[in-house]
Amino acid sequence: MKKLPLVFSGCLLGLAGAGNLVLDTLPVLSHLLSLTGLSLWIYFLLLHLFNWKETKQELTKPPLLSGMATFPMAGMILSTYVFRVFPHLPLVAQGLWWFSFLLDLALIAGFTIKFACPGRRVHATPSWTVLYVGIAVAALTYPLVGIIEIAYATLSFGFLLTFYLYPLIYSDLKKHPLPLAMLGQEGIYCAPFSLLLASLVRVGGASLPTWVLIVMLLASQSFFFFVLTRLPNILKQGFQPAFSALTFPTITTATSLKMAQGILKHPFLDYLVLAETVICLIILLFVLGAYLNWLRKKV
């Protein structure tokens, strides 16, 4: 099998998230998506460890390094799948979670020192939100390790960085627009508020004020529909490996909507959940199929 590029880690997160999204409605599909995600996650890890010299060189590029946070994020979500399949082996699932969480922290620290400190800062791209806000996936999955303080800390960090990064990225992109090969990163715009909403629901549950849910839902959905309007422009450029950035943000948006609907219970939202689930699964399957075709041509 051809070496999977580093940006494919976005598809790993997409598979992991999709497996959780349809868990209660399509359990067989959920198992298939999660198992595929876990298998590819392990393969991806071993492949890049055995080719570490080449991988290390690729990680000197800021957009690639910041986007690599999708790998530990996928690991934290997949650890919940491991626990569902092997409930009698909680240490295995928890070990995967801690490995992924610590790797995410290491990526944040390493990237900040190299590319985000004053005097060294490169221009920001949407993948910065994956790196700095994506750590909030720890709040989404914290029940596996049972340390709610981690959930509070990562959720707070995610909120602060979201409101700091959006204006920064907008300002930098006005001066340095995304190159065509990275246009897929525009899909990331809907990820931060969606992840924060899902994590809020996980931590706060029914105790969350309704207005908080509605405000977060409006922000999440606004960015989701903005991303949908950008899809024609992204797709007409032809397939790029960065298309992986179209998968996990849309899946996260559908997941957050579904979790919020579990509390709001508004009839209209049921139809929206169904529509967004179908849309994000189509995007995931399309990108995976395009990747398969792309890899076949490169052999």
Where are these regions (language model features)?
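Long, repeat-rich segments with strong aromatic
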Residues: 201, 207-238, 252, 259
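Helix-coil boundary and interhelical linker segments in multi-pass alpha-helical membrane proteins
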Residues: 20-29, 82-92, 140-151, 200-212, ...
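Hydrophobic, membrane-facing alpha-helical anchors
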Residues: 40-57, 98-117, 136, 159-173, ...
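N-terminal signal-anchor module of multipass membrane proteins
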Residues: 1-46, 288
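Structural signature of hydrophobic alpha-helical transmembrane segments
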Residues: 29-42, 90-105, 148-162, 210-221, ...
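Aromatic-anchored, glycine/proline-accented short structural segments
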Residues: 157-216
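C-terminal functional regions that serve as terminal interaction/effector modules
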Residues: 17, 35, 40-43, 220-228, ...
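Juxtamembrane helix-loop boundaries in multi-pass membrane proteins
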Residues: 1-19, 53-80, 97, 113-140, ...
